[in-house]
């Protein structure tokens, strides 16, 4: 349980009356050193996403960046709330999604933001999406049940009528900051702003193009040929009237959880830069304890399997998540010993001996092996295809395990037995992903070394 008073030692204190228990993924914080920045300052490690005891969900944030013009008018605030703190603050203090929106926007109003981001705040009844791109401006939308959009570090909000007060919460200065910056696009008299056009700037993104191709079921989009109308969300209809929030993305079918997982596996949405991926599956009806399923994956989603959790019932995580390992060593010169790889920028990274003892470590090691090779030895396209096939088969096993978990939880007759059934099942699935990944890594590492040895004999 988080203390309702939270301070980063920078003079800013967020204080509320209540504090709630929550389940969240976070980085290891061994010896009091934050692994995100390697410092000992007082903020918590990045709690990527999670759910609290009231059923409030907060997604991981997606970093956003306002243009130089708007930031010159309303710059980020050094002591403002940062992305690494949003999940911690909201989950410990909000009892509904709407309370979470009110809390976050009040912090933006009063303390400001240290950077821009987009974040989902949801409960069983409502889902809100909040974007901020400068120090004190923000726009929050209550989403309709059918809206589809994505946000690969690009503001997703297009033309928004701020008079839709049931579904829109906006900072009082949202239009005026853009006007002062000379970037405003919209109709100030009608209280309408195009947030993306006014604040965001460049929208070219290979990930956006890949996502549009996947969602539209086509292959025609590139980062150079799509426009805001292809992806942005809006509440302004063709005649200028306020309508439920929509986007122009029309899915070719009703998406399942597996379809959503495949979205994250689409390159370059899936890549070695992935750290954690969270997919919240929420039912608007039924027992809150089982209405929310959080699917999680670590590292590169191209080669991965997602594990389901009932966050309201989870009381522990698999032991393999709790392993603290030594640091990876980075160098500019090729290492002479150990297991290492060279990334696309020419930097060398050497693993500690215990790296694959942890869930994240072994996932990271296999991802880098498939992407960059190992000790100068490269894998083949056949190796990569085999890894994808292995994870696809594993995902099907996990889907079957998830069905068994749901049945076991439904059959349990006490809260404690439901918690045990859910926790044990999710931990077993996590262990299965770890075991499969370690086996794949060791086998492929040996194969690349053998190929290198044969090649040296031939030459």
Please provide the spans of the model-predicted regions.
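Long, well-ordered mid-to-C-terminal structural blocks that present hydrophobic/aromatic surfaces
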Residues: 236-331
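Short beta-strand scaffold segments in enzyme catalytic cores
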Residues: 117-122, 127-130, 139, 276-281
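Active-site-proximal beta-strand/loop segments in catalytic clefts of secreted hydrolases
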Residues: 60-64, 124, 297-300
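Charged low-complexity "KEKE/polyampholyte" interaction tracts
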Residues: 301, 311-459
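Single conserved hydrophobic/aromatic residue that forms the stacking wall/gate
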Residues: 1-14
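N-terminal accessory/precursor segments of enzymes
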Residues: 12-97, 133-220
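A conserved hydrophobic secondary-structure block that centers on an alpha-helix together
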Residues: 84-86, 90-117
